[in-house]
Amino acid sequence: VLFGILIVILVWGSINVTNCTDGVDGLSGTLTIITLVTFYVVDNIMENKDGFTLLILFMIICILGYLWYNATPSRLLMGDAGSRAMGIFISITALKSGCPLLYIPAAIVIILDGGLGLLKVSLIKAFKIHILTNIRTPLHDHVRKKMGWSNTQTMVRFSIIQIVVSAAIVSVLLV
């Protein structure tokens, strides 16, 4: 029962934080690709031969096709349907990996970017706690509007952070 509840939380959380991360040209798609590549590499290190890794590659190819038209200035928008589909696919990938907790570091930038807003609203609605008031959410809005980052800087810097974390995951597994 507890595992089922945790699965629901993982899937719901992944869908919503990925959806909240959408909003800067290429950001959500690029971070999703980095996360999926991380799971792909981990699955190969763990020698998971169930065929799901092929689906991961297909999803990456689909997102690359989308990113071709979503690069700044975007000519194609993902919308809720696309970002939610990516979120559910990431959560299913985490579950299929056999180590759902790997979702946290593998998608840490998505979690922080989208999750901060969910946390802020939840604290206000449920407990009337007004912390994080000086932080705009999602986090990509904060760095663009309060720190002066351009859309491209935001996308590249967030991607670099996720690549570094993903490389650390792979390095730990290879040791």
Residue ranges and their predicted role:
Residues 2-7, 11-175:
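Alpha-helical transmembrane segments
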